[in-house]
UniProtKB/Swiss-Prot annotation:
Residues the record marks as active site: H54, E71, C122
UniProt miscellaneous comment: All late proteins expressed from the major late promoter are produced by alternative splicing and alternative polyadenylation of the same gene giving rise to non-overlapping ORFs. A leader sequence is present in the N-terminus of all these mRNAs and is recognized by the viral shutoff protein to provide expression although conventional translation via ribosome scanning from the cap has been shut off in the host cell.
Segments traversing the membrane: none
GO molecular function, one term: cysteine-type endopeptidase activity
Biological role: Cleaves viral precursor proteins (pTP, pIIIa, pVI, pVII, pVIII, and pX) inside newly assembled particles giving rise to mature virions. Protease complexed to its cofactor slides along the viral DNA to specifically locate and cleave the viral precursors. Mature virions have a weakened organization compared to the unmature virions, thereby facilitating subsequent uncoating. Without maturation, the particle lacks infectivity and is unable to uncoat. Late in adenovirus infection, in the cytoplasm, may participate in the cytoskeleton destruction. Cleaves host cell cytoskeletal keratins K7 and K18.
Name by which UniProt lists this protein: Protease
Taxonomic source organism: Human adenovirus C serotype 5
């Protein structure tokens, strides 16, 4: 089941990302068009008409001309295309053309897995990343108090029994973080935890 757009918007607002948050989008996200403003969004790999498949977060720092792509499994571009039929090149081209005079931007992409293979918490991990971006836009991926709460593992080991305790701890840290910072999450904790549980996809 995972997270609904309504839930993600409410949590992101609680986390103080409102001034920069453009919204939740399906795979047709148009990219970042403002040349001077910090901006971020949560984007699904599928069309809205499908009900959605997997959430990722995009963020734009105009000062460093850097576009961040946070994808909780840390899949390669090839794997994203293989698993979700998702490509983001056109999004980057549109962002570069609109937001950078020389049409040149840097892409920084997550490459490690922080989410368990059967977890449905991708949207919640995206909210956590956007909190890091809103507070530490120069280093949102790591080396900040928010993302330091979780530990990445090599994507090649995503399904390895060896790393499942680490990935489970990540999800527990995620829930604890949201309990502390999001009144919406606290009010709907049982429902959200059930819909995003560590073994949710395995039990479907």
């Amino acid at each position: 089941m995972g997270s609904s757009e309504q839930e993600l918007k409410a949590i992101v607002k609680d986390l103080g990302c409102g001034p920069y948050f453009l919204g939740t989008y399906d795979k047709r996200f148009p990219g970042f068009v403002s040349p001077h403003k910090l901006a971020c969004a949560i984007v699904n790999t599928a069309g809205r008409e499908t009900g959605g498949v997997h959430w990722m977060a995009f963020a734009w720092n105009p000062h460093s001309k850097t576009c961040y792509l946070f994808e909780p499994f840390g899949f390669s571009d090839q794997r994203l295309k293989q698993v979700y039929q998702f490509e983001y090149e056109s999004l980057l081209r549109r962002s570069a053309i609109a937001s950078s005079p020389d049409r040149c931007i840097t892409l920084e992409k997550s490459t490690q897995s922080v989410q368990g293979p059967n977890s449905a918490a991708c949207g919640l991990f995206c909210c956590m990343f956007l909190h890091a971006f809103a507070n530490w836009p120069q280093t949102p991926m790591d080396h900040n108090p928010t993302m330091n709460l979780i530990t990445g593992v090599p994507n090649s080991m995503l399904n390895s029994p060896q790393v499942q305790p680490t990935l489970r701890r990540n999800q527990e840290q995620l829930y604890s973080f949201l309990e502390r910072h999001s009144p919406y999450f606290r009010s709907h904790s049982a429902q959200i935890r059930s819909a995003t549980s560590f073994c949710h996809l395995k039990n479907m």
